[in-house]
Amino acid sequence: MFSKKKYVQTINAKGIFNNTYETKIPQTIISSVILKHFEKSTKKPKCIFIGWDGSRCDSMKYLIKSDNEKVSGVNDTAVFSAISEVKNSGGLYISYVGGEENSPQETSTAQGWASALCGKWMKSPWKNGIDWSLDDDYPTVLKILSEQGYKTSFSAIWPIHFENTYKNEIDFAERNKLNQFFYKLETDLELYDNLVERIQGDEDFIFGIFENPDMNGHALGFGDGNYRYVSGVCNLDKLSYQLLTKIKERSTFEDEDWLVVIGSDHGGHSTRHGTQNIQDRTTFLALSKPVEDLME
């Protein structure tokens, strides 16, 4: 039987996160962190935001060793690991989705990524379901940066991103000839190849959403009980590490200031999500710079 107390003890295990469940941060901070990076950088600012759809907060124990063998086993921290590398240079934080307690929203994909990209929780008509599209009051960080002259890109697999959630913003970018581009892919490997192209190109802000943890969770279960879910998270960590390697291979890398963001839109329990329980609400956020420095 699931125990909330045990779940909190797991994610609070010393060594995994830089904060605790009691000091968790809202996913809405992501937009502010990215914009602050572009404002404050003394070199040419760049940012990649790698989304791991459906990756639970406690999945970080598969990648980062804790001081408690009952939590992370006797495994060492993954070597060729994006999460480990980003944590070492910045931090790995417990975060939460699904709105505040007095104004909850669905812990699902549309609400999750939109809240992260817009920097605020969804308005009442958008708190549930998918039949809505962001309006002028909810510009994403991509739109804000492209209007400032930066080139931005959004790469994803789920059709609803393009048909509903970001449709208004896609139309706005096309009408106003903004350097804001959207790419619809079919698989995680296609998405990886697309992100490599973006990294090797001239984009300033790159956002992409991998789907495997969420798909495995819906098919056979979120969490430790489904080895396919575990392997989905671990495989994404390796793919993300390869993306970081591609960034360092850029001929202009030394003249650039890259912020790496890795995060999730929601967790999951059984074969679903969307509720306000801790497994659905609690997520992770990895930043290549300490959050305190970014928010000064």
Annotate the PLM regions.
Residues 2-296:
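Feature captures the catalytic ectodomains and active-site-proximal regions of enzymes
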